[in-house]
Every structure is written in C-alpha cells, then in structure tokens.
C-alpha cells in the first residue's frame, strides 16, 4: 500500500488516514508515522468519541519533548488500514490547548505490524503487512 506525504503548514509529513475502531464505533483519524515514537498515541477526544472511558485504561507517564511530564491511558483498539484490521494497544492523551492535529503511530502497534518505507524524494510512504 502506498500513501502520499501530506502538507501541514507547508511541511510535507508522512501522515496517513486510518480507521480506529472500538466495539461498534469507528472514526477516520489522521496519524503521523513516527519511527521515533515507542507507542501509538491518540488524542483523548477520539477515545471519548469512541465511547472509551479514558481513565479505566492503564495509566502511564512519559517525558515529552521539552522535558514536560505527560500522563496517558492505554486501551486496546482496532486500526484498519487498506481494508485489513489490526488490534493494538494505544495511548490516549489530553492536551490542555485542545485536540492534536493528528495522532502518532510508533514502534509498538505499527512498526511491529508493517514494514514501512519512507521515500521523501517521491513524497511517498509504502506499507507492507508483516506475515
């Protein structure tokens, strides 16, 4: 599966749209494919839309960019990309300034499910499902 890079503020980024599912609810959601992220992280507003009780998940803490401590809650969700469904554990995080523009998919939950090729010159991402 190939996806074009998308522009945000004039900058090309490896952002794709996937479908997040939890029980009978689903939502299309933009995510940055982030090879530097340990886990998949999505905005708390998405959890709320899906009917996930945020604080019933496993609470974790991490240090974000700039050394700021952040708290997030892990929940199992399904992601659908290219018609294929994958169950992952994802962190949901609130941001005081409002929702994030897009989520992030990282090593656990994404790179362990797909072989990812970034081609910046072609402005293209290629995903191959691991067998």
Q: Residue spans of the language-model regions?
A:
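Pepsin/retropepsin-fold aspartyl endopeptidases
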Residues: 1-131
């Amino acid at each position: 599966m190939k996806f074009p890079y998308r522009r945000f503020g004039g900058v090309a980024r490896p952002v794709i749209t996937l479908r997040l599912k939890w029980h009978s609810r689903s939502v299309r959601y933009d995510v940055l494919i982030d090879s530097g992220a340990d886990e998949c992280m999505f905005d708390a507003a998405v959890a709320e839309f899906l009917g996930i009780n945020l604080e019933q998940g496993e609470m974790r803490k991490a240090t974000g960019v700039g050394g700021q401590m952040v708290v997030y809650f892990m929940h199992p969700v399904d992601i659908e990309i290219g018609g294929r469904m994958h169950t992952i554990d994802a962190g949901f995080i609130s941001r005081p300034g409002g929702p994030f523009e897009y989520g992030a998919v990282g090593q656990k939950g994404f790179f362990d499910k797909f072989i990812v090729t970034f081609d910046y010159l072609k402005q293209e991402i290629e995903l191959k499902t691991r067998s």
